[in-house]
Amino acid sequence: MKDVIKFHAEWCSPCRYYKTVWNEAKEKHGAVHNFIEVDIDNDNTGLAEKFGVRSVPTTVVVKENKDFQKQVGALAYGDLEKLIKG
């Protein structure tokens, strides 16, 4: 099981586009992976700092609580699929 984390903000235009792609992937893979959404303006978890998030949207996929891949920008559905499967 992987943690798929989306860092976003309400004021971010690309984040609004990406929400549709994210929800589609979450619907398809949500039973297998943990999908976590973090609003960087209200992040009291410290996750943005932990993963070095400097812009939104950013997607991080964590494998087995250690190795992770990070992609900055609003991804197309196929690119998000590759990141999750990678």
Regions inferred by a protein language model and the residue ranges of each:
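Short active-site neighborhood of thiol/selenol oxidoreductases, capturing the structured segment around
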Residues: 1-10
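Thiol-based oxidoreductase modules, predominantly thioredoxin-like and allied folds used
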Residues: 7, 26, 31-45
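The canonical Cys-X-X-Cys-His
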Residues: 12-15, 59
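Nucleotide phosphate-binding site architecture
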Residues: 13, 23, 41, 68
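Short alpha-helical
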Residues: 13, 42-43, 75-78
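Typically the conserved alpha-helix immediately C-terminal to a functionally engaged Cys/Sec
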Residues: 16-29
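A short glycine-leucine-enriched loop at secondary-structure breakpoints
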Residues: 50-54
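Non-catalytic, surface beta->alpha helical segment in thiol-disulfide oxidoreductase systems
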Residues: 55, 60-86
